[in-house]
Amino acid sequence: MLTLARHRRRTWFIVVLASVLVAACGVVAWWLLWRSPVQPAQPAVTTPPQPTTASVETKLLVMGDVYWGRYINDWSMASEQKYAYPFHRLSEFERDNYDAWIADLECPVTNNPKVSSAVEDDTLKFDCSPAYLPEAKKWFTAFTLANNHTDNQGLEGLQETRQHLDEQGVQYFGDFEPERFDDICEVLSLPARVGLSDGTTKQGKLPLVWCGYHGVFKTPSAESVAVIKRYSDLFPVVAMPHSGAEYKAEPDEIKSTFYHALIDGGADVVLGDHPHWVQSTEAYKGKLIVYSLGNFIFDQQFNAEVTRSAAVDMTLSVAAADAPDLDEWLALGETCAAYHDDCLRQATDQHLTKLSLKFHFGVVGSNNSGKIVHRATDTELESIKQRLRWQQTIQQLTGSNSGE
């Protein structure tokens, strides 16, 4: 009986102790909860959507003949600016307002020994020093080489010219010989501004086709013109022909017929040169033709006609809503800066839809009297526009083309 009583007392003691411990734990837990602040529920972390492409725009300035040989070289070497001399007033044309400048380089660029300016003037065999290119590339994005002087140092000189341009990162297109079909047109990678859906912009590259045609000594063949069609089903095309009689205010029928053929062949714009004078313009089938832009950087000084020129201010734009493949085109544009690249094949293989670009045109006047090119005065610009018949032509342009 005594043993049973002791067992019962021990069991009761254990039960009481356990109850006390449980109660103590409860008190401690309540105290801890009371002391701890209640943490609010954390909101779910969301990543804002990436902005999408809304539009693309590129603003170009296209000039006429550019040349730094002969007397320009003499003036440069006599100046403080040396190789920068031909370009030292180009800031007047507000380069920062443009994505690219494109012009006609009317001279082979070689390291060949140079003759005197008098001999070069007599023979009209041009040869320009590559020492000017580091300065030229600060301004010019691309050159056409389709003219009557790029062969003046032979085919080797033309090949060396391309090599020097490659080394400086300047793009080019066209050939002295219009029957070398593979050299006529080139897909250029041109800087562009990409508008995004959040209202910001970024830099991009837009692939556009430029075709150069030399037609001074013979009109390029129908087969040569047909090269445009290889590209125009996919790309917007700008043609820069070099042809026609010199020192004339109007094109002859042979020239106008050829320029019409370029539009008929698929070109969206035709911007000509060679006559050393500004010539008239035309709206042909809703497309702009400028028959001659005139001398931009050149050493001719003998009258007002050869010292003035027109540069075409050209803005090309497209909205994403009108271009289902716009991002793919921008990606392609990053790959098109090399000469004879495969951008046409890439666009074909990807089955891209041709960009329906809107064109807006304006005119900037230049004057190189006083042995240096500079911006034309308002009066000079008005005279240039009258020669171009600019207002009438722009009024005639319809559809996607507009201007001022």
What is each model feature region?
Residues 42-43, 53-55, 250, 305-404:
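A short C-terminal boundary segment appended to hydrolase-like catalytic domains
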Residues 139-142, 253-312, 318-322:
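Conserved beta-sheet core of the metallophosphoesterase superfamily
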Residues 73-88, 123, 187-240, 246, ...:
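Binuclear metal-dependent hydrolase catalytic cores centered on His/Asp/Glu-rich metal-binding motifs
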Residues 98-111, 147, 207, 231-250:
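Short acidic, glycine-rich surface-loop motifs adjacent to enzyme active sites
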Residues 69-71, 109-112, 148-162, 179-185, ...:
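Active-site environment of divalent metal-dependent phosphoester hydrolases
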